[in-house]
């Protein structure tokens, strides 16, 4: 009982979280941020009167840095990019010790984070809690951000001023959910120390999970801290990916496995995970930088396979890895084509929103619309896919190599409902 009380005190202390928060409404000036103008007062003006002295270069930069932080809070990547090009500093902080870079880490803004890293973010910069971006991201369960930071070389085991490392915050201040499960696995895969006791609680991450009643996180931590180091990390990685064992994937990566290792069919771990729809495995691999466009000996990639399986969950998992939507399979097709043929309604509904070319013609001379008609069964699933494709702007006039249009194919097959859709 005594240990529970000791452990609970720091949790109450930081119940609001150690990082992030939100934009302050009326911050005081700080050395590198400049003074925020009052409402209605032009930036760089001391009084709000027009005709005041021209702003100094320092004040202009301070105002620009303020606008950059505002853009960061709004996750307005385009505006942030413009400001950075104009000279705004991704490391400039306000009086609450927030910078555009640190905001990206706590809020889980992956594209913004990548922008700030390219713009020279100080990877080990600290917030007001003396915490790194890794600690902030781990606390919020942002596994993808955690993965990018680990790949960028951030200090994996820094202790903030209340005695927590990133792994401690992910468990003690987190939740027993899928996002935190991914975060813990990614920290393990990236080599974070997993058995250190928090100076403030006296607990290891495993003990923290037990105290919080987080059975899922406790199981993960027990698995990754007690597993034997694999003698062949690459073989262990591929086997774990095929089996859907996300904990074993983390252990293999922790042991130094090449994330792009191939099996006898040139399949990577991510391709195996996509093929068998092992989403938790894919989440760890994507966070750690696995390639969504790696071809196997059948000219399949992790992304292309989603069109065959129809897994929307896997599609969503792979999108942050920035897959090439124009990559073609061995038939010269893009992922919407096999999905349309196979009647994967939910997948087609989602993939048409990605910007993929829905009028792409494969080596057989067929578009997704043609395949939905020619290789479909004319039933409700294929009717809905035709409806989705047309609503997304698919060109119903594109004919096959024999000059036969989708409408003519539908009429020849007696698919009256589909023909009616195509006549509209």
Predicted regions and their residues:
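Ankyrin repeat structural motif
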Residues: 76-84, 109-117, 142-150, 176-189, ...
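Ankyrin repeat A-helix N-terminal signature
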Residues: 70-75, 103-109, 136-142, 169-180, ...
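Bacterial signal peptide processing site
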Residues: 19-22
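Ankyrin repeat boundary/linker residues
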Residues: 61, 94, 127, 160, ...
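C-terminal motif of bacterial Sec signal peptides marking the signal peptidase cleavage site
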Residues: 15-17
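Start-of-repeat signature of ankyrin repeats
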Residues: 64, 97, 130, 163, ...
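Leucine-rich solenoid repeat scaffolds
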Residues: 194-226, 396-424
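Ankyrin-repeat inter-repeat connecting loop/turn
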Residues: 90, 123, 156, 194-195, ...
